[in-house]
Regions:
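A short beta-loop-alpha structural element at the N-terminal edge
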Residues: 1-15
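A short helix-loop-beta-strand connector motif used in the catalytic cores of GNAT acetyltransferases and
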Residues: 41-54, 149-152
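Conserved beta-strand in the GNAT
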Residues: 55, 61-69, 76-81
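Conserved acetyl-CoA-binding loop-helix of GNAT-fold acetyltransferases
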Residues: 82, 88-101, 124
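Conserved active-site alpha-helix within GNAT-family acetyltransferase domains
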Residues: 93, 114-149
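Conserved GNAT acetyl-CoA-binding A-motif
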Residues: 101-114
Length: 169
């Protein structure tokens, strides 16, 4: 079942994110890795900043999360994670499909350039990488992340983003 996460599920969201994010250790730049990957304070800040988490549940247990955040004229997909033991079972696909229905605006996704599996996943579902120049512009305009993260990230956009106004690939 997919539904919007409840406030009282904060600790479960935190657990899912940090369980799945362990995959980044050794892949992303060492100066960007920390344990836990996302602290409770950082998660609270993301929620307070407008990220709404949706969850995939099996028998009332949270197995995966994906956040959605309207920012200016786009919607961002944020913090998409599936418990390690449940990965490659279609959970992220189901969450992405559900969240795409929630947005009337073009969707953008930012991820680490080293997260090749994530990039392939989004490309498989119709998203395309934007040019490096456009990536830098978009990350500065729509995200609040450090310059170091901008330099080591990519942005993917869905087709309607490219169609609605002239952007460079």
């Amino acid at each position: 079942m997919i539904r919007r996460c409840k406030a009282e599920e904060f600790d479960e969201i935190y657990e899912v994110i940090n369980d799945a994010a362990a995959r980044y250790e050794g892949l992303i730049p060492p100066d960007c890795w920390k344990e836990p990957y996302m602290s409770r304070q950082e998660l609270r800040h993301e929620i307070d900043d407008g990220v709404v988490f949706w969850g995939y549940y099996e028998e009332d247990k949270l197995m995966g999360v994906m956040g959605i955040q309207p920012v200016q004229d786009v919607t961002l997909i944020r913090h998409a994670y599936v418990r390690t033991a449940k990965q490659n079972q279609g959970i992220a696909k189901k969450l992405l499909s559900r969240l795409r229905k929630e947005s009337t605006r073009p969707i953008l996704i930012g991820t680490w350039a080293a997260a090749v599996w994530a990039i392939r996943f989004y490309e498989k579902h119709g998203f395309k990488l934007v040019s490096p120049e456009e990536k830098d512009r978009l990350l500065r305009k729509y995200w609040s992340i450090p310059e170091r993260q901008i330099s080591t990230s990519v942005v993917l956009a869905e087709e309607r983003w490219f169609e609605e106004s002239p952007h460079s690939l």
